[in-house]
From Swiss-Prot:
This is Glutamate N-acetyltransferase. GO terms for cellular component: cytoplasm. The record marks T101, G102 as: Involved in the stabilization of negative charge on the oxyanion by the formation of the oxyanion hole. The gene is argJ. Gene3D superfamilies: ArgJ beta chain, C-terminal domain, L-amino peptidase D-ALA esterase/amidase. Disulfide bonds: none annotated. GO terms for biological process: L-arginine biosynthetic process; ornithine biosynthetic process. Pathway: Amino-acid biosynthesis; L-arginine biosynthesis; L-ornithine and N-acetyl-L-glutamate from L-glutamate and N(2)-acetyl-L-ornithine (cyclic): step 1/1.
Amino acid sequence: MRAPEGFLLGGIKREGIGVGLIFSERRCAVAGTFTENTLRAAPVEHSEEVCDRGVARGVIVNSGHANAMTGEEGYQDVLRTAEAIAELMGAPEDEIVVCSTGVIGERPPVDKIVRYAREVWEDIGPTERHVREFSRAIMTTDTEEKIALYEGDGWSLLGIAKGAGMIHPNMSTMLAFLLTDVGAKPKELQMWLRDVVNDTFNMITVDGDESTNDSVVLLANGSSNLKVGSDVTITEFQRALEEVCTELAEKIVRDGEGATKLMIVCVHGASNEVEARRAARAIASSNLVKAALFGENPNWGRIGAAVGAARVDVDPDELRIAFRSSEGEIVTYEGGPVDFDEEKAKRVLSASEVEIVVDLGVGDASARAWGCDLTYEYVRINAEYRT
């Protein structure tokens, strides 16, 4: 595994502070999607402005301090950081994306972050080691790295993400960086990214809490000398984006704080896509459903209640609810309660990956969402961690 052509990465973690750098040897077209939380962090405001201009040269990420709800001082910290990293990279400061993750209400120690960034810069590179060092540097409560790679014919797309708690994006803390060496226009990148994020990152939930710092950034530097639309088909590039983002989204949920099971919610038979998405997210977000999954309890009534609470069109006489895993499938409701084998249901739900399949019985639209179970360990982690 290597970074796409022309990208260099690195990272360091020390004294509870992580610093990661991404640098492109060529200027990049850039696109981004960001949290809709009304108390957005200062770096989100800055990075969205960079993405709106459509050109970037580098990224700095710090973990440990979210720099959210920190007022004007926090925004000045972002500008100071961007200025220092721009000087380091030999780029304009308005081409530096700045991202932060960590404790809300805490300003970042800019001088220390810049000092660590200079150390990272001395050993920045494209190898698997450099990619993994960046990935580890941006982690907070994560227990696993989240990396995905798509390799095309003469080009590639690398995705690196972090996130384990406060995951209920609308684009937890969730950060994702997508790097490709194909060429593309910023407006096209923004359109493709928005569509893919809506079907992947915006359909995951760990705890229903939307962070102040959620950011997904896509950088395309054209170093492969291949362009989307002429050398690489738009269809293939969109497929690559979807595959990488889907893999990252699943890894985030699988690594949810305290999680023991990945939940995949598949909703079919909805009247339209909006309602399918709403129903899928409602099920994946339900604490009662998540707790039942942890207990390996086939409590289909909680799923039905979540669907009803989503205010979507559903035909009770056609409604179907089933659980599916590597251990088999069990139907629990089909126009009415179904007598099922409780022992088989327990086996189906004992798997580490469980699908909840729901047919609303009113149309042809479908959607998919990802979630995880709710465990005692989640409560312990968040009782002790200051968000």
